[in-house]
Amino acid sequence: MTMSPAVDEAAVRSIAIQAATGAGALMRGSFKSTLQVDATDAHDLKLRLDRTCEESIVGVIRERFAAHGILSEEMGYAPGTDPYVWIVDPLDGTVNFFHGIPFFCTCVSCHAVQQNDGSPGEARLPDGRAVGGAVAAVIYAPVARELFVATPRAGSFLNGARLVLKPLASLSDAIVSLSFGARDGSPSYMSRLLPAMIERAQKVRSLGSTALDIVNVAAGRTGAFVQMGTNLWDFSAAAAILREAGGIVDTTEYAPGRWKIIASNPGLFSEVRRLAGQ
């Protein structure tokens, strides 16, 4: 792959933090209030707040990096003229938010854009170009006021404290989180995986926010997370944070834009991957 021209990493990180915490303040101010629902289906919903938070994030990014592309859950993909793309999930855990469960976050990351060379597992944008490494990645959980930040080769941090994972020896010492989707074969897949995890892990949980599930692994709270049926904006920022903390992230695009993800403590990855059928 060709290398993208240099960008001011400190400025990117600062804007990512500003965008994420600004959206988080909007969430915190609206949490447990009357909410306007824009769309629903049998297993999901969209709030007007999703769009409001997205507009806030995009506005912050555009003010400083107008030539960068943006891929966001609500607005879709807007390519830029510079070889960088921001990947945004304005509100990850919308259903939790709607029901008053304080487990949700906003996700913002900036990545180099590169020509697609067909590498296995390579994430691609709608225009066919590849998503490269993260320049900066931020997850903000507004109720807990937890700010996760990662930049390449500089590490991952939670509220300023460095995250460094120590390998765990056994699943029996760890909580494993699973995300139960309703589409793409996820129910049948999880019905096979769940009994194996219940038997081997200390506990199994399903918490409802892909990004927070992944950074919980980075923080050492859980040992692993497995999901089938997720999107690039759900995991891009969190995956960068986990990798910089010393964790392992394995992704498979099994259908266009649909991903299976394994996020793990380094000491548990082989066993989790085996159980997950990789």
Sequence positions of predicted segments:
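N-terminal subdomain of lithium-sensitive/metallo-dependent phosphomonoesterases centered on the IMPase/IPPase/PAP
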Residues: 1-91
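DPxDG-like acidic metal-binding loop motif
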Residues: 81-157
